[in-house]
Amino acid sequence: MAPIGVLTALDQARTQYYHFKAIVIAGMGLFTDSYDLFCIAPVMKIVGRVYYSDGGARPGVTPPAVVSATVGVALLGAVIGNVVFGALGDRVGRRRVYGACLLLMVCSSVGSGFSVCRTRRCALASLCFFRFLLGVGVGGDYPLSATIMSEFANRRTRGAFIAAVFSMQGFGILASSAVTMAVAAAFDHYTGYPAPLDTPECADLAWRIILMAGAVPAALTYYWRMSMPETARYTALVERDVVKATNDIGRVLADLDLGAVAEEEVAAALSRPPPPPRPSYGLLSRRFVRQHGRDLFACAAAWFLLDIPYYSSTLFQSQIYRPLFPAPGLINAFQEAFNVAKFQAVIAVASTIPGYFVAVLLIDRVGRRCLQMAGFLLMAVFLFALAGPYDGYWRDHGAHAGYIVLYSLTFFSANLGPNTTTFILPAELFPARFRSTCHGLSGAAGKLGALVGSIGFLWASQQKDGAAAGHLPGIGMMYALFVLGGICLLGLALTYVFTPETMMRSLEENESDRAQTQVGDGGSDTEAAKSPASMASSHLSMSPILPARVSV
């Protein structure tokens, strides 16, 4: 199957400035996602001191049910956002929906800081509401960021570009820690370093500033997001306007003779035999399941299995930093939040960000499938190493360097492998008219796994006898870690059996291979787009093909 000329030009384009600009623009949603995820832990320390200092079993400590609610509503919103905005990205267009997601994230981040009511219950309910909306926006950004980057990238470095977009999560963690530490230190100094059990009224302002700060980088990129053209693959394959696609690419990519590309494509379209009709099968139809069901299952199941141990490990941090810092009863609210953020920054610098960088370096050399299997295997090994001697040694030696190293290596392995590859693969395996939707479905499955991991781990890690206040008895930390390691091995087996390799293959080749296994009901989207009708501008108006370059 001969490819469309403009898509061939995209696959062969050299790496240039616009690619790196697109990485930053597309990565801001992931930046906001990790900022929101990691700032909530220190924020809830301050919230506990502000709203739960008047008695109770543990004064100054946010109840587990409230912590679970603030985490859970954002993840639930992300499930909905993945599905809804993923589908809209295929139906309305990537660019327009992209801007809507960003506005929702900005408004809900600001709204989280304005969760002001007269009662504690009302204030926290308002916070959960805005965090739900934030989750919807962040969830919608997942499929759109990955799809846009995959459709702009060239074949040779596509994996590295998408992985670089995803690596913005690491910088979001650092930003979250830096902002939290700066705000906490400033308020601590301004209030004269209050006593441990003395929480100034201005602490109610501190946590709001931390939450609202997440809106700033997202808001700064709104103009550039709306200046981006629609992706050429969406315009050519879904809207079936190859000339407009060529025109759009001419605005942003340099050193491509797009006029010649368009002339050749028009001539070829007029001389070639009529293409097969555009495929008419719908999402989750029988033909879709035959052609793409296996890939959708592989992507969704792997993401679901990954996020259970990944988000559980995030909550597991409290078991590690607790022995390293003074007890909460010996420090004030600002100092406690500062210590939590400081530990998160150390883990990010030592394991999370290096894992992303190694993934960017290896993804187009080793391949997605191998990295995903290696990551799952290493995660299982390190979780088992934490679990085996936990009751006999680690529980009483949590500050031991070996304990922290094993925990850090778990995050490194996740980001080196499945945490990155599960974001990349759904953006490469499906036809253009289903790409954003299928990525959204896969991402929604991942966030469901995150819900299971976040809420389930809080219960499972409790001891059968003597569970922490507010928790039901669980199976204990040691057995919970063994379960997480077993889930990683299941992810390894699933990847080996079901996940295909997409390295060094164009997006159209992935679609074509699956379309060739079917007969009837039309051909692939790429073949259908090669009709003279899609060249509606024809030879009479080729001047728009070479517009003046614009900066976007």
Curated annotation (Swiss-Prot):
Single GO biological process annotation from the record: phosphate ion transport
Gene Ontology CC annotation, any one: membrane
SUPFAM superfamilies, A to Z: MFS general substrate transporter
Signal sequence extent: none
Keywords on record: Membrane, Phosphate transport, Symport, Transmembrane, Transmembrane helix, Transport
Membrane-crossing segments per the record: 23-43, 69-89, 97-117, 124-144, 159-179, 204-224, 296-316, 343-363, 370-390, 398-418, 440-460, 474-494
Domain of life assignment: Eukaryota
Principal location class: membrane
Localization: Membrane
Pfam families linked: Sugar_tr
Similarity annotation: Belongs to the major facilitator superfamily. Phosphate:H(+) symporter (TC 2.A.1.9) family.
UniProt name for this protein: Probable inorganic phosphate transporter 1-10
Organism of origin: Oryza sativa subsp. japonica
Top-level taxonomy: Eukaryota, Viridiplantae, Streptophyta, Embryophyta, Tracheophyta
Gene: PHT1-10
